[in-house]
């Protein structure tokens, strides 16, 4: 586990149950493992940048799930106040936007980080 529930809560997260946290933590950890090609899975000490990425990924995932519940799974694309008009984004656009946010979070925290052998964590080639 890259980030404990107590750490997540201590960094300002509010109104998140342990059950809700566990579900989103697992998704975030799997995403980090996939994007780093498993290079950090067996490290004994969790890097601060990985903790920070986990915190932001979990928070983003929880916010997205709550937004889906609030708007029936649809993301608001625009709102017109005078005529009281609400437009919703297409489902594919919403998923692509969220994937881009997750990729940016990972890139922000893990770009430039290397293994003990000098291989960048996000490098997609072979570690030869």
Model-based region annotation:
Residues 1-128:
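Divalent metal-cofactor coordination and adjacent catalytic microenvironments
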